[in-house]
Amino acid sequence: MKKMGRFMAVVIAGLLPSLAAAQDIKSYLPVTDERLLHPEPENWLMYRRTYDSWGYSPLARITTKNVKKLAPVWTFSTGVDEGHQSPPIVNNGVMFITTPKNQVLALDAKRGDLLWRYRRDLPEDLFQLHPTNRGVALYGDKVFLATVDAHLLALDARSGEVVWDQVVGDYLSGYYMTLAPLVVRGKVMVGVSGGELGVRGFVQAFEAETGKPVWKTYTVPGPGEAGHDTWPGDTWKTGGVPVWITGSYDPQLNLTYWGTGNPGPFVSEGRRGDNLYANSVIALDADTGALKAYHQYHWNDAWDWDEVSAPLLIDVRRNGRSIKALVHAARDGYLWLLERGADKISYVHAEPFVHQNVFTKLDLETGRPTYDPQRIFGVGRRAEFCPSVWGGKDWPPTAYSPQTGYLYVPANENLCSALTGKQEEYRPGQLYLGVDFSAIELLPSADAKDHIGELQAWDMSTGKKAWVAKFKSHNWGPVLTTGGGLVFLGGTNDRYFRAFDAKTGALLWQQRTNSGVTGVPTSYEIDGVQYIAVQSGWGVDAQRKQELLDKAFGTHTFVPQGGVLWVFALAK
């Protein structure tokens, strides 16, 4: 009875959000399927701007020649601490950003004036590991938000008022959401977080107009479903495999591509088997949610190597052959090149982009790795492995430039980890790791004193690394590429936001901000002026990782918190 009372209080609180409207937006351009398929160069309408997840803006007024004149033109303090990771989404001069704790801000993208603000009242008994949010989706005259208490909201784009509110999961069972929704053909798609809390992951689609559920596809197959036999006993019920980063979409195949997270608990000996569809890319029919194809990057994961970053859809010409590719820089430290088809995902090539000592070889036909058993920890058995639990690259997205043909990877080198397993009993809504969370070890190599963070450029036509920029700090920075031949990146603990020459890797410009820049940068144009926008606000795993590095090095690194949106343009 007590539990029901808490639940009713949460429902009531969810119906009473905090909304501050400075002014309604009188002129708002509705977002259509056509505009999402072919966005205007001056706008940034979705998480990575285009369905192929390139993170590329064709705008070219800011170039390698004049970027040194880039300067702040306005800033906006969000009033919130913790990790700010969402991209500034821009539609016809109106900007939408989100912050931790599910605040949505609508701003005049030219002047920085507040148009409206939405704050969600979150339940007091909510438990999650990541209060962050990675942005909104747009469709019609609505703004869609996936919340940390596992609701999907449709807000009126002009006023911020709630149009509909749909429950996606039970937060008391460990479900929460941090991703930006994906809108395809009138459907809003989301995945869930909670892989460390014993959830059963899924992707679900809803009608954009009404919020009515359309389909739901579990990432851990149940009885009678293909792949169920890769989970012993009842382990599938608490198998994890969350989906917490926005997917990609191929309109020709009508398939959405999603990266999936780790199985649970971390210690793998109690769930022996491949544990499908963990640590994979899955292809789902956009209309029905039917699983059409998958590729598992690594099986029976024991290193917390989520592979949730959606692959980039790139046409690659390699060894005289044209490939409709899926490209993924993985947390497991390998750069994967796959080929996508209507009902198949085929392995083409993979190689490590950071030091990796777990895989001893890959099958030449399938890409399936063979493991060094000494790198697999167990109950009461410690094992060291490289890269670390945060991987060669965590969630911060890569970007691609069609000008250079390069993929740009925000990597972390010279870091390993150690884990020791323990027996763990599943309790709904609580940590289900099989390890002591406070005893996770981060082990810098000798070369870490030289550098940890990297920005790598990989030539997709040759499969070779073209250049690398190195940083003493670890790197938690999403990447933006532009038509001006530039690559933008933050992510370091020195609080700088930087611009590099996309072809050579030369550092051309940098600006120190209030905090660490962990937000996804975007670019847009108004009245002939190109802008670069990014949120600065350190926290969540960037800070957790920094604390472990300080412990390993015997240092103390202070990175101020507090979210600020920075908007830059060329000085006149």
Placement of each model-derived feature along the sequence:
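Blade/loop signatures of beta-propeller domains
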Residues: 23-72, 219-226, 369-375, 444-445, ...
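N-terminal cofactor/phosphate-binding cores enriched in small/glycine residues
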Residues: 53-169, 481-482
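Extracytoplasmic beta-rich repeat domains
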Residues: 76-89, 117-137, 165-180, 197, ...
